[in-house]
Structures are given as C-alpha cells and as structure tokens.
C-alpha cells in the first residue's frame, strides 16, 4: 500500500527497475494490506472486551493465533518491564530527568508519553497482537500493532459512525473544556524555519515556547537585598600602612608597591615560593594550629576595642558618680552607638548578627541601665520619665497610665511632669475622651494651685510654677476649642477675667480653693459676664449683694434679634456630606458663645435647644487659677483677645505653641509682596480663632465675626481697658485699631467696595474716639494707625495731614522717643512705596521726614528738596545716636525695655535714611555694624542666643533689625535690578539664629521658589532641621517642596497640554512624604494638628485614597481631639461619613448637627 494515495498509481505501475527504485520510498513494504479487515473486526469487538473488565484506555485487540513467535513475546515483556520501571522512577524522582531508552517501537517522545498515561480516555483504538495470514509477515505486523495506537482516521475500511463508549469518563474534560495536556500528541521542532517561504519577505511565528535555549543571566544583587545587607554587617578588615621613617621633604607622589622587596622562600614543597602558610599545611595534610586558628577572634579590631574602652569608661564613671543623672542619660544614649557595632555582647557563634539587628535588645539594655540609675537616684524625675518613654514599646496603655499616676502622686509639684502627663493622656486614642481629659486638666490646675498656696506641705512650689500654670490653662482652652467645645473655652476665659481683675477684697487673702467656692454663687447668679452687655464684674455683684435691694434691668430697645440664618441649608441638591459640612461649620461660627437665658425676654434654661451650649460651674471651677504677676495678668487679656481673633501680638508659650497650630495661614504672604516695607505681618500665626474650622487652604484673613461676635469683642475691650494704664493700655488700643484695619485690608483684598466703605467709616470713627481720650492725645502709636488707615483707604493727602499734625505735636524730641521714630519711619516708608510715576518726589518727601526727625526744631511740612548740608547733619546725628544706644546696650544688664525699643526704631530709621541718600550697600553696612556690636558684646560665643532675660531681649532686637534688613533688600529688588544672592545670604544667616521666625521663613521660601536649582535649598533645610528644635523648619521645607512640585506640574501642563518637562525633577512626591514622616518623629510634630492636616491633604491630592485613610487613622492616634481632622476626613472620604461621626460621638467631640437632625432638615 502506498504511503501517499496521490502517488498510488505511480508506485503500482509495472515499470522497469530504474523507475521503480526512484519511487520505492512511496511504498511501505512492512505494512500488510490484508490486515485492514482483521483490524476492523477487532475494533467492533472492543466493547465486548470492555465488558469483561479490560481497561478502556488501553484495550489491546486480542489475537486468536496460536502460533505466536517467541520474538513477539520477548518484545512484549521488555516493553512492559520498561513501563513499570518508568512508573517507579516518576514516583520517586519528581525533580530529576531520566534517560529513556526505547526499543524500535518507541521512536518519539509523544508515543512514550501517551503510552505511559493510565486511566485516561483515548482517541485511538488500542492494538494487540494481530493474527497474520502469512507467516513471514506475522512477526512484523504483531510487533507493530502491539506497541502502537491506531487512530480511527487511519483505518480506511471503517465506514459510517465509529465510536467507543467510555464507562469511566474523565470529569476534567467537562470542567476544563479541553483534553489533558498529557493526552495531546507532542513533537519536537527542529528549528524555526519553514520550507517554501521567502526568508527576506516572509516569516512564521510559531506558537509555544521557543526552541532556542534560554541562557539564564545572573543579575547583580542590589544593596538592599538580604544577602547584601548581611555583607554590610560583616566586620571590616582593619588596614594599616607599614611604618616608614617620615620624610622631611613633601611627597608629591605616594607609590603603591605591588611585590615584596625580599625574594620568596622556596622549599621542596613550595618550589616557586607562591604558596601561603595555609596552602603549605594543606599540601602536607595538616591543619592550622589550634592557637593560630583562634587568634583572629581573640584580637578584635581597633573600632571594637575603642567601643569596649568607652563602655568600660562609662561603667567606671557611673560607679564613681552614681548621682550624676546626666551621665546615666548619656550612657543610655550611648547604647545606640554600641549596638551599631558588631555585637560586643555576642555570647555564642552566630548570635552576633541577630543581636545587632534586634531593637528589643537595645530597649532591654537601656531599660536595665535606667533601672540601675533610678536605684541610685530615687528622686530623679528625668530618669523616671526616660523609663516611661522607653516602656511605651513594652507595656500596655493601661499599665502606662498607672505608672504615670504613681509618678504624678510622688511629684505633684513638678509642672513639667504634669505637662508631659497631660500630653500622654491626650494622645492615647484607646483611652481618650473629652470629658476625661477636661477633668484631668482641672485636677492638674487645682493641685498646682494647692501647691502654690502651700496647702500641700510635703511639696513646696518650684520656681516658675505660676507661669507654667498659665501655660497649662491656655493649653486647656485651645484643647477645648479644637475639640469643638468653644463655649467651655470662652467660659474659662470669662471666669478667669472676673476671677483675676474683679475679685472682692474680702476674699483676696483666702487660698485659691476658698476663692473658687465664693466665686460659684456669682457664676450661677445670671449676672452678665466678661464680653456680655452690662457686665460689671464679680466685685460689683458682691457689693450689690451685701447692700441688698433690687437691680432694675432696662431692656435695650435698639437690640434686634440675633442674626440667624432662616434657611440653614441653602441648596438641597448638593451631596449629603457637603450639606452637613457647610451646616456644621456655620453653626461652629455662630454658636461659639455660651448660651444663657435672657431675663429681659423671660427665658429659662429649658428654652435652650442645644443643652451643650450651656456651661455649668462644674465645667470650669477646677481650672481657675490665681495670677499674682502683673505681666501674666496682661498676658491673660492678650491671650483672650488673640483667642477671639484680634491680632494682639501674643504668642502662646512654647509648651502649647504647636498644639494650637491647626491652619496653614503661616504660609500666607498676603500683600507682603506688594508692600514689603509697610504691610502688617504678625510674627505668629497658624492658630485658628474661635469658631473657625475652615478647610485647609482656605485664605485666612481677619474677616471679623458676625454681629454678635463683634459686639462681644467690643464689650471685652470696654471692660479691660480701664484696668490698665500707660504702655499696656496703649497696646490694647493699638490692638483694637489694628483689628479694625485688618478687616479693611480684607475688604481691599476681596474688592468689596460696599463693605469697604462702611468698614472704613466705622474704623475711622473708632480711631477718632480713641484719640479724643485725654491719655491718648499724644499717643503716637494711635496716630500712626489712624494715618495708615487713611492711606489704605486711598486718602493720601488726608493721611499726610494726619502725619504732619502728629509730628508737629511732638516738638523737639529728636531721636529719643521710639514711638516718634516709628511714626516717622512709617510715614517715610509709605512715601517710598508709592507708584513709580511719583517715586522721585516721594523719595524726596521721605528724606525730608527722616531729616527733620534729627533736628531740634519743630517739624514742618514738606516744602521742597532737602539741602545736602541738612542731609550730612542728619547722618552725623544718626551715627552719634546709634553709637550711644550701642554703648548703653553693652553696659546695661538686664536691658531695659525702653532701651531695646529705642535701638530698634533708631536702627530702622538710619538704615532707611542711608538707603534713600546713598544706596542699599550703605543700609546693609548699618545692619552689619549693629549685628556685630550686639553679637560680640552680648553673645561672646557668637551663637546669637542666650538663656538670661538680657540675652533674650537683645535677641529680639537683632531679630527686629534683621526683618528690616530683609524687607529693605526685597523692596530694592522690586524697584531696581539687584542680585538675589545678598538677600538669600541674609535670610540664611538670620534663620540659623531665629529658626522659629515665620516671617523670615516665608521670605526665604518665596525667593528660593524662583530658583530652578533646589540643591542649596534642600541642603540648608537639612542643616537647620538637624540642629533646630522648632517645627517651623520642617513645615516650610515641606511647603518649599510642594511649591516646587506645583511649578513642575504647571510647566508640564502648559495651556492644558501635556509637554515635556523643562525642569527635570524626579522623586518630589517621595521626598515630600519623607519630610512629613521625619517631621512627625518629634513630640511636637506628632502632636501638631496642622502637620497631620497637611499630610492628609497632600496624599489625597495624589489620589492615594487607601494610604490617605491610613494616615488619617494614624493622625487620630496622635491627635484624637482635633475636630478639623474629622471634618477633613468627611470631605476626603464621604463614603465613610457615618463611621467618622460615630467616632466623634464616641470620643465626645462636639457634633452640632447630628445626622438625624440633618435628615429632618432635608425633609422640610
């Protein structure tokens, strides 16, 4: 039979020998044509064999022949043996490749794989020994059909539908919709070529894996892999050069010797002299001597020896001086350095690496040292605090609280310990609640008051107790404000004002506890309190009670109903979370004052819709403290005004400074770029005023309160201004007028002309009323503010008249009055900052003002150009006055306030005078002269800081003059061409001395943002953050990177199109995240709500929602009291609004609009 049916005719043609030989390959002589009939018969008999129990997959056709040859039997037996051996090998050797030796019947891998599978359905009909009709062909046929499958398609005689019934089907065929890969015939492709195609124009892509052998290329491991980290932990080999006699001549080239000078030693075992000692021993069959093998371990390197020497030195010193707590603390800090070295404490081999990387080992070692230190110093609070801080890694929060309570019980007079204890309890999310922390503040202040009064005889009051108590009181007020309980915070301030300034004489000699008991009836009497209309104070109420009689209450007919929004929800189509946020913030803004029943309207306590707005005496009684210092009493008023949003110039104490920061106004330059010389820029910002919980990034200007809030502030001013006199009263008037001017600036910024007109009118009315008072007639601070107001309103000529009038009233004070110098300075600065069209004439006016300041004659208005002789005389007068002030500063200790303020104003005026008459370099020389004099005389070490009161006062002088210096440089760069380097250098030097100055940081970040090279900025920030304790460097470093990221994105998205980056900057996102994480490692950073708000806002802006949620919950672990964090989370994750509000309710934060009430409002 022909292999190819198409050539069947050619192969069977009776041709000659040559043609027959050519087509001989088309025929298969070993195939018997007569076997087709027997194959078809055996195929039909297959079901019968299946029913008899034969396997389905390999049901070989049985042969009926009795004359089977011995050769066929042997072939069959060997094939079966091979199959069994293969099965055993597959069972016991799954991962080894074995050679498969096949006989003549198994020539391809596909046939072997198919035969080796059992119990699988097969497409072919199994063949067995075939009965042959011809004896000479029987052996070959039997051998061929006994070991090969025969496919149904190959059997040409079978007609019709041929199939087999599988009694044991494979369910995998139905599940996977295809045959098992072992049942599919496979073959090996020899090359990827294909015959018949043009390789230049055509190609075939074969499916499956490529036949080319893949060469696995070993990649170089990075430094952070596990293996490389292990290599980094291996001890380094100490390398030391050979000692050579020093040469007197300088060596320009140091040669490296490749070989030793001496000839190698040769032996019979080492004929070339190239083997080392270890190789020689190995060739002899010997090992190294035991002592020699242990020698490297016995001799440590120089680094380990130095560390061991330090450890021994510490141990010796603490044995000799066990009372030295600082030495113990240094020993604890030294453990970090010891653990970085290769395990000095390793006991067994292999233990070194584990101990080196074990944080727990370091903590245990530190804890053991601290316990030894506490045994020798039972009264040391610092050691016990260090132990508690260390044990936060080991102990549960409840255990830590108990240990803190024990420590507080032992040291109830330690204010620093109370401060840390309150912060610890305030930042423990698991045990935190507003009521618990509020009562804890009350317990703290009442205990310290008892210590200060002497009621606790066992513990005397420590120095600075009163100042620390005042700082804790302010910290409690900001805590309540940030938690949303504004009513309680305002009530605390109201009570403290009455308790401090209006105390009856009959109770002044009593201890604080007794005074508080007498104060309770006044609080519950319904008498108007500080800030409320008709408030007279505690003392007047006591006199009225002692005298008896009735107090007639006259209702105010002009008093309208308080302004309330008739429609609290203005747009019901907005999403639910937006409606809630708007309504919640609106209620926070309107309802920050405590609710009290109005007797004129016959109201009772039951008329209050929200009981949380009422403040009981139990909420504030324990927190009342007695302030005997006059400075602290004035600071109390300033803090109250700052709390209400009035720029009083008060900066919170360092202990609660960053706790109070919760909004990003510290980055707002405002109008500073337009008016660098005259724009009011407060030294401190970042803390929201009461009632404000705006979203992050909302422009924060002094917009003022609503009508009731403005009336409340006016009442506070009217109540407290008669309590002070002199400079303090002048400062209060200045703050009030500055608050009104700030609202005018807000109207100018928003271009609200209607409100600007009314606000300007009210502000001028207030200024005139204040100047009409007899004690304020010669108050140059108020005259200065009034003239500045007229200038801001655009009334330049009226403002000049006010300035001229005030300067004419001064007479011939020359340069001795600091307020007069400040008035002249502002007048000159306003003239200088006029538009470029009139700047030449304005400069002449400014020179006239500063020149007249030095003359003994009365001031006269500007008439024309100042003569050169008068300018020279004025310069000499400034020089002599400055020398006199600097000479006094070196002698006087402590520095008087008047002397400091006079030096500041005089230096400013002289710098501006030199700038206008000579140039910017002359002004810079004045600054350098003052700085060098003060820095060398007051701070001999050149650090610019000191611990004494005198050093702090002179530091403030340098800081103010530095601000003038930088402002002058900025103005000069604005009006003329000037390099940026001097301003950058001046700011860099100033920030190293004053790292907490927000004004300097704002200027530095702004000018550095214009530079396309961020490397210097980053190095500078890195230097400052490593050494400075304040948090401002971290905040402004983050802001600088965010501004740079915004600039890069703006360039990349020019005109709404994606373009290539012209500023190649990568890694900004990760750099900013790293800055956030590093800033939060300190205690001040981890408990600063502003830092967490910025971090959360940044991650949300990147679109990383899951990471943002993680940061939000991490923020709650550190600042669970900050309501603004929860409001931000509602804005960023509106789907989880219900969960966030439930969390606020659980922690007792103030929720003014519950969701149930919101649903009712939406239905209405």
UniProtKB/Swiss-Prot annotation:
Alphabetical list of CDD domains matching this protein: NRDE2_MID
Spans annotated as MID/MTR4-interacting domain: 163-266
HAT repeats: 305-337, 395-427, 758-792, 978-1010, 1067-1101
Protein keywords: Acetylation, Cell cycle, Cell division, Coiled coil, DNA damage, Mitosis, mRNA processing, mRNA splicing, Nucleus, Repeat
Keyword Zinc-finger belongs to the record: no
Annotated GO CC locations: nuclear speck; nucleolus; nucleoplasm; nucleus
Bias (Basic residues): 74-103
One of the GO BP terms on file: RNA splicing
Biased composition (Basic and acidic residues): 61-73, 110-133
Record function comment: Protein of the nuclear speckles that regulates RNA degradation and export from the nucleus through its interaction with MTREX an essential factor directing various RNAs to exosomal degradation. Changes the conformation of MTREX, precluding its association with the nuclear exosome and interaction with proteins required for its function in RNA exosomal degradation. Negatively regulates, for instance, the degradation of mRNAs and lncRNAs by inhibiting their MTREX-mediated recruitment to nuclear exosome.
Domain text: The MID/MTR4-interacting domain is necessary and sufficient to mediate interaction with MTREX.
Family listed: Belongs to the NRDE2 family.
Subunit structure: Interacts with MTREX; the interaction is direct and stabilizes NRDE2. Interacts with EXOSC10, EFTUD2 and EIF4A3.
Protein name: Nuclear exosome regulator NRDE2
The species this protein was found in: Homo sapiens
Protein's gene: NRDE2
């Amino acid at each position: 039979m022909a292999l190819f049916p198409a050539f069947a005719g050619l192969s069977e043609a009776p041709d000659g020998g040559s043609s027959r030989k050519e087509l001989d390959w088309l025929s298969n002589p070993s195939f018997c044509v007569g076997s087709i009939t027997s194959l078809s018969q055996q195929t039909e008999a297959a079901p019968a064999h299946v029913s008899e129990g034969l396997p389905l997959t390999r049901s070989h056709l049985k042969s009926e022949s009795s004359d089977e040859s011995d050769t066929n039997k042997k072939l069959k037996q060997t094939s079966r043996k091979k199959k069994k051996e293969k099965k055993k090998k597959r069972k016991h050797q799954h991962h080894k490749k074995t050679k498969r030796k096949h006989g003549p019947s198994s020539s391809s891998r596909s046939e072997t794989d198919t035969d080796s599978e059992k119990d699988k359905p097969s497409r072919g009909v199994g063949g067995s020994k075939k009965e042959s009709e011809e004896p000479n062909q029987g052996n070959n046929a039997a051998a061929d059909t006994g070991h090969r499958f025969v496919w149904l398609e190959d059997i040409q005689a079978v007609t019709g539908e041929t199939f087999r019934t599988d009694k044991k089907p494979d369910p995998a065929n139905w599940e996977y919709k295809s045959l098992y890969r072992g049942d599919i015939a496979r073959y090996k492709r020899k090359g990827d070529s294909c015959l018949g195609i043009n390789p230049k124009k055509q190609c075939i892509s074969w499916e499956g894996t490529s036949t080319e052998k893949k060469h696995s290329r070993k990649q170089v491991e990075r430094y952070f892999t596990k293996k490389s980290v292990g290599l980094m932990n291996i001890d380094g080999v100490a390398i030391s050069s050979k000692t050579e006699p020093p040469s007197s001549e300088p060596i320009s080239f140091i040669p490296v010797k490749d070989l030793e000078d001496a000839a190698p030693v040769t032996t019979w075992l080492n004929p070339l002299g190239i083997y080392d000692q270890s190789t020689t021993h190995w060739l002899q069959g010997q090992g190294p001597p035991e002592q020699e093998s242990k020698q490297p371990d016995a001799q440590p390197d120089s680094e380990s020896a130095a560390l061991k020497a330090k450890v021994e030195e510490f141990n010796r010193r603490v044995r000799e001086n066990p009372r030295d707590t600082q030495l113990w603390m240094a020993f604890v800090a030294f453990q970090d350095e010891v653990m970085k070295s290769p395990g000095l404490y390793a006991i067994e081999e292999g233990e070194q690496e584990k101990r080196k990387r074990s944080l727990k080992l370091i903590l245990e070692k530190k804890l053991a040292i601290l316990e030894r230190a506490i045994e020798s110093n039972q009264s040391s609070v610092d050691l016990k605090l260090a132990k508690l801080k260390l044990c936060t890694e080991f102990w549960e929060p409840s255990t830590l609280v108990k240990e803190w309570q024990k420590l507080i019980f032992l040291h109830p007079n330690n204010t620093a310990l109370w401060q840390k204890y309150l912060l610890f309890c305030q930042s423990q999310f698991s045990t935190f609640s507003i009521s618990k922390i509020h009562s804890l503040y009350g317990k703290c202040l009442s205990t310290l008051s008892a210590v200060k009064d002497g009621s606790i005889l066992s513990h005397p009051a420590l120095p600075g107790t009163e100042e620390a108590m005042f700082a804790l009181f302010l910290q409690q007020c900001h805590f309540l404000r940030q938690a949303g309980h504004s009513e309680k915070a305002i009530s605390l301030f109201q009570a403290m004002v009455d308790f401090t300034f209006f105390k009856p004489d009959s109770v002044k000699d009593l201890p604080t506890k007794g005074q508080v008991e007498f104060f309770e009836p006044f609080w519950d009497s319904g008498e108007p309190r500080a800030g409320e209309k008709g408030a007279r104070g505690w003392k007047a109420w006591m006199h009225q009670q002692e005298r008896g009689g009735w107090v007639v209450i006259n209702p105010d007919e002009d008093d309208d109903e308080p302004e309330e929004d008739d429609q609290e929800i203005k747009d019901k189509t907005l999403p639910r979370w937006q409606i809630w946020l708007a309504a919640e913030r609106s209620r926070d803004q309107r309802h920050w004052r405590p609710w009290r029943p109005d007797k004129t309207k016959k109201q009772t306590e039951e008329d209050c819709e929200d009981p949380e707005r009422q403040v009981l005496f139990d909420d504030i009684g324990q927190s009342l403290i007695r302030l005997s210092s006059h400075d602290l009493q004035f600071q109390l008023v300033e803090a109250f005004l700052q709390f209400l949003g009035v720029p009083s110039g008060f900066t919170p104490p360092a202990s609660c400074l960053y706790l109070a920061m919760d909004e990003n106004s510290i980055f707002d330059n405002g109008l500073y770029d337009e008016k660098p010389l005259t724009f009011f820029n407060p030294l401190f910002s970042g803390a929201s005023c009461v009632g404000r919980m705006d979203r992050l990034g909302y422009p924060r200007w002094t917009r003022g309160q609503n009508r009731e809030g403005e009336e409340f502030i006016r009442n506070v001013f009217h109540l407290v201004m008669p309590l002070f006199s002199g400079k303090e009263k002048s400062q209060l008037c200045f703050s009030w007028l500055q608050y009104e001017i700030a609202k005018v600036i807000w109207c100018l910024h928003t271009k609200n002309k209607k409100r600007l007109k009314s606000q300007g009118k009210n502000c001028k009315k207030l200024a005139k009323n204040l100047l009409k008072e007899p004690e304020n007639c010669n108050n140059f601070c108020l005259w200065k503010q009034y003239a500045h107001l007229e200038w801001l309103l655009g009334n330049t000529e009226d403002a000049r008249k006010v300035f001229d009038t005030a300067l004419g009233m001064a007479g011939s004070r020359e340069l001795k009055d600091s307020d007069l110098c400040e008035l002249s300075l502002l007048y000159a600065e306003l003239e200088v900052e006029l538009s470029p069209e009139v700047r030449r004439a304005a400069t002449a006016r400014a020179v006239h003002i500063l020149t007249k300041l030095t003359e003994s004659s009365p001031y006269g208005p500007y008439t024309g150009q100042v003569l050169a002789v008068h300018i020279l005389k004025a310069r000499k007068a400034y020089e002599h006055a400055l020398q006199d002030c600097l000479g006094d500063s070196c002698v006087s200790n402590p520095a008087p306030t008047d002397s400091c303020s006079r030096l500041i104003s005089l230096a400013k005026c002289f710098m501006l005078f030199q700038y206008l008459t000579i140039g910017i370099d002359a002004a810079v020389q004045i600054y350098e002269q003052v700085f060098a004099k003060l820095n060398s005389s007051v701070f001999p070490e050149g650090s610019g800081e000191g611990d004494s009161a005198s050093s702090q006062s002179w530091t403030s002088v340098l800081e103010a003059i530095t601000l003038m210096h930088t402002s002058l440089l900025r103005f000069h760069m604005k009006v003329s061409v000037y390099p940026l380097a001097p301003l950058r250098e001046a700011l860099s030097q100033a920030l190293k001395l004053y790292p907490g100055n927000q004004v300097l940081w704002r200027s530095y970040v702004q000018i550095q943002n214009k530079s396309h090279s961020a490397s210097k900025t980053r190095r500078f920030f890195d230097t400052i953050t490593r050494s400075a304790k304040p948090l401002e460097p971290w905040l402004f470093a983050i802001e600088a990177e965010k501004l740079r990221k915004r600039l890069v994105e703006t360039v990349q998205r020019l005109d709404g199109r994606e373009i290539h980056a012209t500023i190649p900057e990568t890694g900004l996102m990760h750099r900013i995240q790293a800055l956030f994480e590093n800033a939060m490692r300190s205690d001040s950073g981890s408990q600063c709500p502003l830092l967490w708000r910025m971090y959360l806002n940044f991650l949300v802006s990147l679109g990383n929602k899951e990471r943002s949620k993680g940061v939000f919950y991490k923020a709650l672990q550190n600042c669970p009291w900050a309501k603004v964090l929860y409001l931000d989370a509602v804005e960023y994750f509106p789907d989880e609004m219900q969960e966030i509000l439930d969390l606020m309710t659980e922690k007792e934060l103030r929720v003014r609009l519950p969701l149930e009430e919101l649903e009712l409002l939406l239905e209405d």
